Amino acid sequence: MGLELYLDLMSQPCRAVYIFAKKNGIPFQLRTIELLKGQQYTDSFAQVNPLRKVPALKDGDFVLAESVAILLYLSRKYKAPDHWYPQDLQTRARVDEYLAWQHTALRSCCTRAMWQKMMFPVFLGQPVPPEMLASTLAELDGCLQVLEDKFLRNQAFLTGSHISVADLVAITELMHPVSAGCKIFESRPKLAAWRQRVEAEVGESLFQEAHEVVLKAKDMPPLMDPALKEKLKLSVQCLLH
């Protein structure tokens, strides 16, 4: 059995892995795990990833979890072009720096913005206090400012003049609040221009393909299965803080 990627394109790290593999011509078998249907809780998936999270990679008998680890594994194994994860010590350190920051900063507020603005009220039927959403959106705005001032600065991409895995991870995060109707690029021309450059490097068709599911999420019908609804609510209550 060749390379298998367990993904749900509703998930931002899954989209980053999907885009990277497709863009670099890496052959893989897509194994879709639909998070909103609770497929991550099945015993069969737990045998692949006991953490019950996606993305997950299976390469023969080798199994790997965590999106950053998967991206770097694919980059090394398939000898992706150097710009994705540069050999230059300091440029690579800049990529590592961004990946270390975003996991608890940008990812956290992007995920909470999307769920509080759209998924809780529309999909789970659970209203979110306006003051909570306002606080989350203010935090997101602060993270976007750090993204501009600390990482993008006056460069073409987050770590220099070429696209890297840092840009893939960042753009897929930002499309989460975009899918919920947050106009995060409208008042930030520098970030908007960066987004256009990332899309151009990835390819508009691939970018749209990877984000089709999440951009249609606002049209999903409410979840009706009461048992699954309660299970999902419990798993995402941390996003209401």
UniProtKB/Swiss-Prot annotation:
Main location, first listed in the record: cytoplasm
One example of a Gene Ontology biological process annotation: glutathione metabolic process
Domain (GST C-terminal): residue spans on this chain: 88-222
PANTHER family: GLUTATHIONE S-TRANSFERASE THETA-3, PTHR43917
Keywords linked to the UniProt accession: Cytoplasm, Transferase
Domain GST N-terminal, first and last residues per copy: 2-82
Similarity remark: Belongs to the GST superfamily. Theta family.
Location(s), subcellular: Cytoplasm
Tissue expression: Expressed strongly in liver, and at lower levels in kidney and testis.
Catalytic activity, EC: 2.5.1.18
This protein's GO CC annotations: cytoplasm
One protein family per Pfam: GST_C
Keyword Cytoplasm: yes
GO MF assignments: glutathione transferase activity
Binding-site list for glutathione: K53, V54, E66, S67
Gene for this chain: Gstt3
Native source species: Mus musculus
Catalyses which reaction(s): RX + glutathione = an S-substituted glutathione + a halide anion + H(+)
Name the record gives this protein: Glutathione S-transferase theta-3
